[in-house]
């Protein structure tokens, strides 16, 4: 057996419907489109969202919400990540540049430190925002917090 001798299983491949090729083919005449009406014509396509004259769902449902232009998006970083980063690179001070170098955040993202995990070493952590519990945990471990 080799690749050039492989064939699909018997009955696995069907020949396609050749429509509109005369009455002898069995698929001539209306060519599977039925008689008359917009759907039988060439170039037919119904509008996206058209429901046959019924009020479409996008008009039945009310508008709601808005996008707040003053929203500030923070990239969350957990204490467990800071701990592993400090152990791997033997750091006592962790800045946003260190997080960028480690590939954890992009250059123009704002960083918020969250309290998932524990910190055992005294770390000086620089970030744009801290959760209360994360700030308390860093200070309890003998470290300090610098808000940018």
UniProtKB/Swiss-Prot annotation:
Q: Species name for this entry? A: Porphyromonas gingivalis (strain ATCC 33277 / DSM 20709 / CIP 103683 / JCM 12257 / NCTC 11834 / 2561)
Q: Does this UniProt record's set of keywords contain Phosphoprotein? A: no
HAMAP family membership: Ribosomal_uL15
Q: Which UniProt keywords apply?
A: Ribonucleoprotein, Ribosomal protein, RNA-binding, rRNA-binding
Q: Which NCBIfam families match?
A: rplO_bact
Q: Which GO terms describe its cellular component?
A: cytosolic large ribosomal subunit
Q: Which gene encodes it?
A: rplO
Q: What is this protein called?
A: Large ribosomal subunit protein uL15
Task: Quote the function comment for this protein.
Answer: Binds to the 23S rRNA.
